[in-house]
């Protein structure tokens, strides 16, 4: 909702259309299946955390979207377990990043430069560790979008 407050149109994508239920029982409408997403039509890729990245990282469409954003040097924001998708996409080598503590070793093995900070910004890549870091994560994501749109 913070991105919508900042005046951005938001589409939620997942394996298929319909509804998904978040950790605290909130339902979210899925606007597009991953296969329907054209990365060139979007300014920002947000990879939320929780349990979903463990499934999404096995989806070829999710990997292709992440690779396209990183290759195009477009803003990418990942929090908690979200960086697992970037790990599977092979796009973190030499990049500064953070993630949920249980993913940290995997992040390092993928060639990322792990930093245990509430938010890490490396170019147009924004990463955070956990839900408690959301204020810093959102602040940096919105700031980055402001720079990217100029």
Please state what every model-predicted region is.
Residues 97:
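Anionic-ligand binding patches
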């Amino acid at each position: 909702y913070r991105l919508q407050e900042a005046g951005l149109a938001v589409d939620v994508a997942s394996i298929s259309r319909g509804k998904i239920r978040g950790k605290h029982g909130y339902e979210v409408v899925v606007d597009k299946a991953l296969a329907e997403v054209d990365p060139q039509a979007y300014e920002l890729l947000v990879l939320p955390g929780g349990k979903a990245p463990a499934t999404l990282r096995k989806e070829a469409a999710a990997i292709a979207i992440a690779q396209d954003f990183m290759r195009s040097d477009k803003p990418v924001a990942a929090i908690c377990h979200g960086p697992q998708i970037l790990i599977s996409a092979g796009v973190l080598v030499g990049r500064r990043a953070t993630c949920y503590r249980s993913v940290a070793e995997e992040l390092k093995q993928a060639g990322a430069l792990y930093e245990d900070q509430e938010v890490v910004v490396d170019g147009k890549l924004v990463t955070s560790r956990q839900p408690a870091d959301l204020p810093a994560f959102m602040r940096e994501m919105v700031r980055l979008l402001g720079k990217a749109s100029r």
